[in-house]
Design a protein with these regions (language model features):
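Class I (Rossmann-like) S-adenosyl-L-methionine-dependent methyltransferase catalytic domain
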Residues: 2-111, 125-206, 218
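Flexible metal-binding regulatory segments at protein termini and peripheral loops
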Residues: 7-10, 206-277
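Conserved acidic residues
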Residues: 114
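A conserved beta-strand element that flanks and buttresses the S-adenosyl-L-methionine
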Residues: 117
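Short catalytic micro-motifs in class I SAM-dependent methyltransferases
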Residues: 120, 124
Length: 277
């Protein structure tokens, strides 16, 4: 394979707690629909188990949680990194014991959920975090648990939000999840019509999904070579490295020993692979 250099998709904005808190303090929340997105509302109406454990990451003003409570759901958790927002939510839901409001980083969150709702969280993350997103979602879902919601099927001139495509999502989530649905949403709000994919991804509990920190790769050709070598391991089903070559997920039928992975890349002394726990 060619070892030529290639562009790396980066995000120049520091999309940290300060950035997002400033958006809420300035009321600069252009992504806020002011209501539940219709495709998500339609799906919620099909969930019979009102005691199902439901997580909403990057929850924002969490109209989804409000609707869930109205429909009688009793085990809802929402998490966001912005203190100003979270304090407001705690005041709004102060007298409701059916919702837990968490201030924190989604990737540090622990728990098990039957459903996780995706609503403008994936697109708010720098693209370099997409592999980590897949790993964490798989980790947080119960066996047969489902990730459902909306992903953009378009690009944006100014980000965030960060766009994506059907082909990218299929490559990213394959084998870690079973695709019950991934198609153009039929009832998006007018301003997002024909740009949103509705997804229902069921956790594939039969497969192992592991995330690794990787050091030493500097070009797409090198990345392709390493990925190909990992694909040759018996039982490996999918390999996906992020756009700055720093993280990689490996989906496999059984756990792959870290020493095996390190030995495979030992042909270049710069390469180091470390499992994320």
């Amino acid at each position: 394979m060619s070892e030529e250099k290639c562009c790396v998709v980066t995000c120049d904005l520091p999309l940290d707690q300060t950035y997002w808190d400033n958006q809420y303090q300035a009321n600069a929340t252009g992504w806020d629909l002011g209501k539940v997105s219709p495709p998500i509302k339609t799906y919620i109406n099909t969930i019979d188990n009102k005691e199902a454990k439901i997580l909403i990451p990057g929850c924002g003003n969490t109209y989804e949680a409000e609707y869930l409570l109205e429909q009688g759901f009793t085990n809802i958790t929402v998490i966001d990194i912005a203190p100003t927002l979270v304090e407001s939510l705690k005041q709004n839901f102060a007298n409701n014991n059916n919702i837990t409001i968490v201030l924190g980083d989604f990737f540090d969150h622990q728990g098990k959920y039957d459903f996780i709702i995706e609503q403008t969280f994936f697109c708010a993350l720098p693209p370099t975090m997409r592999q980590k997103y897949v790993w964490k979602m798989h980790q947080l879902l119960t066996d047969y648990g489902k990730l459902f919601g909306l992903l953009f099927n378009r690009e944006f001139e100014v980000s965030p939000p960060f766009g994506g495509s059907l082909n990218e999502y299929e490559q990213l989530f394959t084998k870690a999840f079973i695709f019950n649905s991934i198609s153009m949403a039929g009832n998006s709000i007018p301003s997002r019509a024909n740009t949103e994919l509705f997804i229902e991804f069921q956790k594939n509990e039969l497969n192992q999904v592991n995330l690794y920190h990787f050091e030493g790769i500097t070009c797409c050709g090198c990345m392709n070579t390493v990925s190909s070598k990992f694909f040759e391991i018996n039982g490996v089903l999918n390999v996906s490295m992020n756009s700055n070559f720093s993280e990689i997920i490996i989906v496999s039928k059984t756990e792959i020993d870290i020493n095996t992975l390190q030995e495979i890349v030992s042909y270049d002394e710069k390469y180091k692979i470390i499992k994320t726990n």
